[in-house]
Amino acid sequence: MFRRPRSLRRTSRKEPAVTSHHLTDRHRAALPPWMPLSYTDALEIVSGRGRTVRGGDGRDYLDFYSGVAANMLGYDVPQVREAIERQLRTGVVHTSTFYLIRSQIELAERIGRLSAIDDPVAFFTCSGTEAVETALLLATEYRRSRHVIALRDSYHGRSFGALAVTGDRRWQGAGLTPLSVDHVPGGPVRADAGEDWVASCTRRLTRVLDDAAGPVAALIAEPVQGVAGAAPLADGQLAAYARVVRERGALLICDEVQTGWGRTGRLWGYQWDEDVRPDLLVFAKGVAGGLPLGGVVGRRDVMSCLPMPSVSTFGGNPLSTAAALATLDLIEERDLTTRALHTGRALRSLLTGGLHGLASVRRVQGRGLLLGVAFQDPATAGPSAAVARAVQEKCRENGLLVGLGGTTGHCVRVMPPLTVTDDEVRQGAALLVQAAREVDQHWRNS
């Protein structure tokens, strides 16, 4: 039997369900149409504690999406809250990078040590998109080339350059770009892809590099393709790519926006393969416990190549970096990286076993606590966004929040906070399995 999420402490806030419709109308009137909302009846989250949130509908939900992985430690974390409040009491929320910021310097030193990059230097931004854009600027300037290689089905952000290297077909052709971009294979379609797949991918990358008219700036890669539905690269694929790129003098940019900080069961997703050493590493999402913070850490010679002075007005601000230091303290003190490995294996096993035999389920994929369930139409065996959406809706009915992804929208994304308990893993898995079984039964009977 599964249990509903435990109740949060009641507040004086009025939370009538009817307000969501009015708020949705205001959202659609004031914000662009390309900002989608989850669920037929859109949800407002009004409070949270641990891994449980309360919606504007008055219901409590177990959150297995974590604000798209940004609420990495969950909600109302005392140590992070205290670090933020301590900084707020100084009266200084922002100064800009024209001034010394102690917490920014301490965080840069710490991330440099954790990156495993030789002689590292860090630069802070406000988001993963901005961090990717910075990495592309550095790589193209360092190599004096605007030619970048990226992976198919990847997603790197919604800015000019980040969209150019994004390999997800839904975002291609969205606008002009100053970059020349080639795409090589990302994660394999089959879960059992092995050495033959890696060899084929490596040959494709080699041809692109050898056929280039001039130097190639970089290869940018996600170790696990998050928006694609938590699709990991095959074992050895990133290492093979890194070797070929290094032999030809191009840089390796690892986009760890979703995979960083222990979520995959390694501190960095690139560490699932041996002999991978990125030249530039991009991070964001959960590093500041839910506050906006991103950045790039990389080799000193690459990070020092810009010919003009540059600043980041809000990147690395005192408030976000104070929260980030507290977040990293908790990751290390509680060994959340190892915990993500073990709880991720348990969650994946529960999902795989519970979903076995369902005609609408393709596979469970991912690493650690970055997981995806791929769905298909039982009649055609083609990927089905409609089935995935129905499962997401049914999960909410059951009291569980999950996300959507996949190159055709056919995946349910499962990314609970790294602090998720064993009981919550079992509870969340049971709720998702129940939802998928109900949808599968309905789909086969319709």
Where are these regions (language model features)?
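Short, Lys/Arg-enriched N-terminal segments with co-localized hydrophobic residues
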Residues: 4-17
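Conserved N-terminal phosphate-binding loop of PLP-dependent enzymes in the Aspartate aminotransferase
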Residues: 18-446
